[in-house]
Amino acid sequence: MRTGVVFFLTGLSLAVAACGSSGGPATPKTNPQDGPPAGYPDGHATVPAAGQAEDVSSPTTVVGTGTAASCTGDAFVAAVAAGGVITFDCGPDPTTIVLTQTAKVFNDKGTKLVIDGGNKVTLSGGGKVRILYMATCDQAQVYPPGPGDCNTNPGVQLVVQNITFVDGNAKGIPEGGNNGAGGGAIHAQGGSLKVVNARFFNNVCDDLGSDLGGGAIRKLDYLVAAGAGPARPVWIVNSTFGGKPGLGNSCANGGALSSIGVSWNIINTLLSENTAVGHGANSGNGGNGGAIYNDGNEIVLNVTSSLLENNKANEGGSAIFFVSNNKTGSITITDSLTRGNPRGTFETPDLPGFYVIAKQPAQIVNSQIMR
C-alpha cells in the first residue's frame, strides 16, 4: 500500500421518466424509486458551514427546458464542461438521465462546480460508463491556473447535492493513466469534493486491484506543502450509499468510498450493503474496506451520527479499513452505530468490522460498534 441550511430528503421518489444523451427514452438498470431516502434517519448532528449545501439560486447553466426529454446526457456533459453552478428543469416529475459518456470537469472554468439535482434528478451510467470525472493532473482537462504544479494547486471544488447516482461503471480503466481507475460514480483527483443529500446505488469499479477502490467515489490526494497538515477533507453529509439489499456499491476495495492521502468528514450518512470484492489484500488484489477504504499518511477520518451496516470485505475491515502508513493519522467515530459487518480474514481486536493503523487507537465516542 502507498506510503446556510441542509435540506433533508424525505420520501424521495426518483424514477419513471428517463432520457439518454440522444433525447430518446432509455431505461436505467437501477430504479432509484426502489432506494431509501438520502441520509441516516437517526442522524441529527449539526453540520458545519463548510459541509452545508451550496446556494444555487443563480445557476450558470440550467439543463433542460421543462420536459424530461430535454434533459439529455449530452446537455449535462456540456454543462459540466462549462463549469459554474448547474441546476435542472426536467418537468414536474422525477427524471433519470442516462449518460453514454462521462461528464468531465475542466480545471480552467472557475474554482467551484456545483451540481444540484433539486431532489428530482438521477444521473445514471447505464451500467456502462463512469458518471463524473475530475483530475487536476489530467492535461486533457487543462491544468488549473495559479501557482504550483497540478499536484499542489487547489484546483476545483466539486459539489454534488440533492441528487442520485446509479449504475456508474469504472471497470477496465487503467490505474495511473488519464481518466484514472476507481470511482464508479465519481472519480476526483486533486481539488476538493463535497457531497450533500445524495444517494449512490449500484455503482462499481474493478473487482481486483491492490489499492484501487471506490465503487461510488474515489478521491485521490491533493498534496500540500510538507508539514502543512492534511489536505482539505471530503465532506459526505446526509447521504446514502446502498441502503438496502440489491443497491450496494462494489469495487476491489472501498465498496462505497475509497481514497489515498485524503481526509474525510462523514455526517448523518447511511452506508450499507456495500462490498469490497477483491482478494489478497494490499499485497494481492484488494478486498479491504467494505464501506470505506482510507490509505495514506497524515489523514483523518471523522464519522459522526452515521450508520454502517451489513457491509462486507473479503479481507480486512468490512465496515472501515483505515491505514496511516506513518502512523500520523487518526480516526474518530462519534454518535454512530456499526453492526452486521462480518469479519473478513483480519480485523482490529475488539473493533468488529474495523481494521485500523493510526497514531493511536480509534476514538469511539458515544457509539456502538457491534458485530
Language-model features: where?
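Extracellular beta-strand-rich solenoid/capping regions of secreted or surface-exposed proteins
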Residues: 77, 81-82, 98-114, 122-161, ...
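C-terminal motif of bacterial Sec signal peptides marking the signal peptidase cleavage site
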Residues: 15-18
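The right-handed parallel beta-helix/beta-solenoid scaffold, focusing on the short coil/turn
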Residues: 84, 95, 103, 111-113, ...
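Bacterial lipoprotein signal-peptidase II cleavage site
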Residues: 20-28
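N-terminal pre-domain segments of enzymes
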Residues: 27-59
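Right-handed parallel beta-helix
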Residues: 117-119, 155-169, 192-206, 223-247, ...
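Acidic Gly/Asp/Thr-rich repetitive segments characteristic of extracellular carbohydrate-active
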Residues: 63-87
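Short glycine/acidic-rich loop motifs that flank beta-strands on beta-rich extracellular proteins
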Residues: 125-129, 169-176, 204-212, 245-254, ...
